[in-house]
């Protein structure tokens, strides 16, 4: 899954790299909601599982960059709930692509125990028309008591 994500992100980056200096259009600005599905690899309990969730966010264009915030809730078989509040900063790739880094607070609950931590990630987003988008993201979470969580997710959503 990590290799698939790396290949997909590289393909997005190669689509139109010369256009990265352009000013970001309204395609990557405003409120958005979406859903994610993917794979989690928990390095604390030692489990691997399908994960799914929902997110809401807001992005603004600042010159050729895109800055935003995202609130997310996820679930899987062993991690019964993950909440995350993250910021992201990205650059346009061509007219429809966005490459970004993300980071922020995350809280997971597993087997009745709650862990606070930090989530870092890298991702790519592709606009589908004016309002719809798809995305790929690779994430790493570092939590209390030595808990670590890797996630590879894909998502889709709409902007308003």
Over which residues does each language-model region extend?
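Cleavable N-terminal export/targeting peptides
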Residues: 1-29
